[in-house]
Amino acid sequence: MEGFMDSGTQTDAVVVLSLAQAAVLGLVSENELFGATISAEAFYPDLGPELSGAAMGEPEPPGPDVYQLACNGRALEEPAEEEVLEVEAACEKHTRRKTRPPVRLVPKVKFEKVEEEEQEVYEVSVPGDDKDAGPAEAPAEAASGGCDALVQSSAVKMIDLSAFSRKPRTLRHLPRTPRPELNVAPYDPHFPAPARDGFPEPSMALPGPEALPTECGFEPPHLAPLSDPEAPSMESPEPVKPEQGFVWQEASEFEADTAGSTVERHKKAQLDRLDINVQIDDSYLVEAGDRQKRWQCRMCEKSYTSKYNLVTHILGHNGIKPHSCPHCSKLFKQPSHLQTHLLTHQGTRPHKCQVCHKAFTQTSHLKRHMLLHSEVKPYSCHFCGRGFAYPSELKAHEVKHESGRCHVCVECGLDFSTLTQLKRHLASHQGPTLYQCLECDKSFHYRSQLQNHMLKHQNVRPFVCTECGMEFSQIHHLKQHSLTHKGVKEFKCEVCGREFTLQANMKRHMLIHTSVRPYQCHICFKTFVQKQTLKTHMIVHSPVKPFKCKVCGKSFNRMYNLLGHMHLHAGSKPFKCPYCSSKFNLKGNLSRHMKVKHGVMDIGLDSQDPMMELTGTDPSELDGQQEMEDFEENAYSYASVDSSAEASVLTEQAMKEMAYYNVL
């Protein structure tokens, strides 16, 4: 202890403090000059200046006033006797050292600008700071603040500043533009980046085992790395002034903010990876008429109403489509295109064609579809010049040309699978008199029709009815005739209830109930519903009577009159009135009788309803129509296999006339 009091050999115990730390302790002001020396007087204010450099008498253990701090007057607990002895031993150790120069105070500078060679650390023995301290000093040691991080070696003794430490809080960096000279790296807690230029990566310690992610925190080079097991741990970060860009924030608020900032950094990283800087200025604006301007692309001259659409369009030229479908992973340039595409997965088709009611997901598809209903065909074949509404149709058509399977009409451009179909189609462009019969000068559109017609002149009838022995030149004529033997009349008029064997006869009959009579005779000005009825009527004005009876030689101008006459030779009157005993050889005569005598009209041979009245129908028109139908349906129902030769000749003649009137 005597050596400790010797002023000749004893130097003052000094500690390295920065200006900020000295200002916090109340030792110096912030305007203090560099190189100031802090002596033991600052820590022991009760010792006068006369005792600082002279030998002291008996050494006495320091009392409570010795540990009184000048900044706020808070006193520490009195150290134990063992601690006093350790302090004395430490002071004796300093007596054997050489005189050291005054220690410079380190000014408060930014961590990234502090050099290693500018820092000097000295070992200082301070009362109450021993590793064997009692339990009373343990909490204060554990709560040591930012001053602990300024010492590199575990052997360096630190001053207990727990009385001046604040409550542990979390640092949050203020959003601002980073400085260009700072190389800020994104935070990754699992994969820390390697050290650069011998300096550890910037980091800040949380009050727990995990590190706080920060973008602008830098660790000065004189601090020990966090992985050093001997380095003192920082349980509470040192308060930093607001001018450094930090604000205080509680841990719960920080977690909520970092969750959103992480998403923003992820989006920003995606945009950064594009590595494309699109600069759009007013030079992209072009006049669009009506004092409107549009943003026009300089690569394809396509224009848009908004600058954003132009930017996404330019990115599309570079193959960048940032919007992906979650269902099929298809990429799109704009979010509106993605929303339209999602309608296909939802089954929604809002755009409908007004002509055929076909629905589409996009208006562009509907517009392209409308070309099918118009004469506009923008896609033309370079082989034959035929136009198409869709490019897919054009491609499929050109494939037929290349494979030789396409037979195209030179008049209208239609294609056919076979050459026969093409030749038949060409006949429609060459007029109605291409194929003409040499026997009767009748013309036909197709060759097959002329060939069937020539069978009538050659008297070739290969199709024979098994019921009555009637022969027909075509199979469909036999099928129609066979229905008359079955008595099946499946087609019924909805107006008058009359039944028909053939649907064509029923449709022709339905025209009688309409008020439209477009066909008129130029001789008597009588009007008719059907063209065929007018042709039949014209025979009345002709002096020629082509229908002649083979039995008596009587001639008739209409076929049904000849058929009725033949019933007289046979002695048969098959049509009987249901109201009286009158019989008739023709159904038309029976109908006329029922209309005049009884005021009703019969329904048919098998179903005669006397309650059905004929209203709004011309009797002559009805009789003529019924006579035509009677000829087609019932003319041959009374011929038998063992008929005479005359009847057979008559039947053949009737068949010829039927074919004559059926062909327009």
Swiss-Prot record:
Question: Where exactly is the Glycyl lysine isopeptide (Lys-Gly) (interchain with G-Cter in SUMO2) cross-link placed along the chain?
Answer: K110, K113, K377
GO biological process entries: regulation of transcription by RNA polymerase II
The Gene Ontology terms for molecular function here are: DNA-binding transcription factor activity; RNA polymerase II cis-regulatory region sequence-specific DNA binding; zinc ion binding
Keywords annotated in UniProt? DNA-binding, Isopeptide bond, Metal-binding, Nucleus, Repeat, Transcription, Transcription regulation, Ubl conjugation, Zinc, Zinc-finger
Question: Could you tell me where this protein is found in the cell?
Answer: Nucleus
Whether rRNA processing counts among this entry's keywords is no
Q: What is its main location?
A: nucleus
Which SUPFAM superfamilies does the record associate with it? beta-beta-alpha zinc fingers
Could you tell me which InterPro entries the record lists for this protein? Znf_C2H2_sf, Znf_C2H2_type, ZnFinger_BTB_dom_contain
User: Which cellular component appears as one GO term in the record?
Assistant: nucleus
Q: Sorted alphabetically, which Gene3D superfamilies does this protein's record hold? A: Classic Zinc Finger
Zinc finger boundaries on the chain: C2H2-type: 295-317, 323-345, 351-373, 379-401, 407-429, 435-457, 463-485, 491-513, 519-541, 547-569, 575-598
In UniProt terms, what function does this protein have? May be involved in transcriptional regulation.
Similarity comment: Belongs to the krueppel C2H2-type zinc-finger protein family.
- What is this protein identified as? Zinc finger protein 710
Q: Which organism is it from?
A: Homo sapiens (Human)
Which gene is the coding source of this polypeptide chain? ZNF710
